[in-house]
Each structure stands twice: as structure tokens, then as C-alpha cells.
Swiss-Prot record:
Enzyme class: hydrolase
Name recorded for this polypeptide: D-aminoacyl-tRNA deacylase
Gene: dtd
Source organism of this protein record: Chlorobium limicola (strain DSM 245 / NBRC 103803 / 6330)
Protein family according to the UniProt entry: Belongs to the DTD family.
EC nos: 3.1.1.96
């Protein structure tokens, strides 16, 4: 499982003209599910995202996790995180899990993040084309990968 985690002042996602999710200060997380991922990877990634200490404490050091700041999380599925363009210019996505296998793991990650965060998580719409907007804070952007063997 791979996540691109961005500290934001605000973020939103839209699909079509009628569906919209947004947060204020917090984390925008783009989440990709790889071939072979299981609920173990979803749980590990969920804990890691919520526990990341990337918000400033009173001394101005990155020392606080999102849950200690009252911040929110916007979680957006993104299968292209496992795109491979090492040969040619058109990326292949064979490293991404199939739609039917990835969706339950994405949903597991949503539930697990909500449990660890202690409040609802805003999400995009799995498998749909979306428009994502954000105002970075810092900017602070991290790329997380689950360990090879859990």
C-alpha cells in the first residue's frame, strides 16, 4: 500500500457537479493499493497516517500528529500511485491491485483511520474520476509505503 500524505490548510475533492467533500487544516491522503496487499497493510498504513508527527508543536517543531491538532483527513483513492513508466512513456499499472480486490482494502483503511482518529474521515468516490484541490501547508509531503513483509 502506498500513500502520498500532504499537510494542508484546506483540501477538497469533487466528482461531477453535485458531489463534494472538503476539509480545513489537516491531511490530504492519496492512497493506492498494490497487488498482494491485505488488511494487514491497510491497518499498518492507517495507524501510520494518523500517528505521523508532522504538525508543529508550541516550539515550532514537527512533533504533533493530526489527531492532537483537531485536524481532519481527506482520503482519496488513487490507483495510479503504482504506475510504472520505466519502459517507454506510457505508464503501466500492473502493480496496482484489481478494482474488486482494492476497494474493500480502501474501505478498510477508511474505517481504520476513523477508529484511530476518533472522528469521521472525508473521502472521495472510489473508482471515479475526481478533481482534487488543496492548499499545501509548508509544504509538507511524504510518501509512505508499507513494509515488504508484515
Amino acid at each position: 500500500m502506498r500513500a502520498v500524505v500532504q499537510r494542508v490548510l484546506s483540501a477538497s475533492v469533487a466528482a461531477g457537479s453535485s458531489r463534494h467533500s472538503e476539509i480545513g487544516r489537516g491531511l490530504l491522503v492519496l492512497l493506492g493499493v498494490a497487488q498482494g496487499d491485505t488488511e494487514l497493510e491497510a491497518e499498518w498504513m492507517s495507524r501510520k497516517i494518523v500517528q505521523l508527527r508532522i504538525f508543529d508543536d508550541a516550539a515550532g517543531r514537527m512533533n504533533l500528529p493530526v489527531r492532537d491538532t483537531g485536524g481532519d483527513i481527506l482520503l482519496v483513492s488513487q490507483f495510479t500511485l503504482y504506475g510504472d513508466a520505466s519502459r517507454g512513456n506510457r505508464p503501466g499499472f500492473s502493480g496496482s491491485a484489481d478494482f474488486e480486490k482494492a476497494r474493500p482494502l480502501y474501505e478498510k483503511a477508511v474505517r481504520s483511520i476513523e477508529q484511530h482518529l476518533g472522528k469521521p474521515v472525508m473521502t472521495g468516490w472510489y473508482g471515479e474520476a475526481m478533481q482534487v484541490a488543496l492548499i499545501n501547508d509548508g509544504p509538507v509531503t511524504l510518501i509512505l509505503d508499507t513494509p515488504q513483509r508484515l
